[in-house]
């Protein structure tokens, strides 16, 4: 390690989500000396294992809530060791880490850009004002605002939290009665979910965007995402990622990188993404922009100020590209070192169970999935006894699977083999008991 690098001090703000702990440790090796601020999460045993892995980077300070991040980082700085950069990968803590970095005058987005990247209501307002394509919307905090939105917007609509995570509480409503029911249910669910860190239940209601399939293969979805890194106000788009159709109601099933769309179509997508990032004032770090493909061109669904789920693994597998290390370099005030060069494709798959409220009676298939040709990694995320709620969003998946290949045509063969390998038996959720037993 060079002396200049060893003298730099990077603080990693950690929580579940983003790259695995072992990958984070490998990505940051030799870049700087590290202090870790880790949010207590999961069971005591799970968090202890996570902290044990993170200790390979340096000392680990534990916090109980995400809103303690700023105080924790100021305490580290007050301890006499200057901080040269702040880094976070998890959407649970990325906002608070960005606020702390700005407070310490370190490389980061402005406070205005940071809050726009977090809150969909402020984001929609900024995009609309700049003329960036996005759906018609209304901000809703109570029944009166909900009634006004119902009168102004054209149904069907989508209800989503202004501050969301993993498709939590995202619901489609065909009429004002469904919307009222969804709002009441989502408000309760949102308050109870620990991932939102006590955020107030502010919602955005927006008109459904009619997607148009730009792909030669109709099995691919009408949404894409763009993965970007920003340094010193320069935007570097790393990849366009294709997405499978969502599982009901709005749950992610799989992503494929790089996109198989023609170059001209990709250029349209990147142009709208650049306009969105400029409208939001983003200048630093990682962004994950989701877009709907329509007959009139790409439309922004949302922009997130973080690495997208599975994106680190996709870039590593398809291009041998370490996005986490590049993001850390930017956090330390350096310029982007390189852009990815793809040698094949990679797929990140999260097969979804049936929509509803269930308890998992049994789950299996890990070894069978691992044996599918091209599968690189399998992580089982749920065990028998876990309860699945229909409002939980993408987090309902029981496995995360990373696969790779040379020709994109291989992907759907892999996908079918993965889905056929999952053995899942579901029973009624203990608290509701409304669903019939279900075997997948």
Please give the residue ranges for each predicted region.
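ATP-binding N-terminal substructure of ATP-dependent carboxylate-amine bond-forming enzymes
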Residues: 1-113, 117-118, 144, 382-396, ...
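Peripheral (often C-terminal) accessory segments that flank ATP-dependent C-N-forming ligase machineries
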Residues: 11, 129, 328-440
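A conserved helix-loop-beta module that forms one wall/lid of the active-site cleft
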Residues: 103-169, 193, 202
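Conserved ATP-binding module of the ATP-grasp superfamily
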Residues: 134-135, 156-159, 176-219, 223, ...
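Short beta-strand-to-turn element immediately C-terminal to the catalytic PLP-Schiff-base lysine
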Residues: 140, 170-175, 229-231
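ATP-dependent carboxylate/phosphate-activation module, predominantly the ATP-grasp catalytic core
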Residues: 207-210, 216-282, 286, 304-325, ...
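A short glycine-rich, hydrophobically flanked beta-strand micro-motif that places a catalytic Asp/Glu
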Residues: 283-295, 435-436
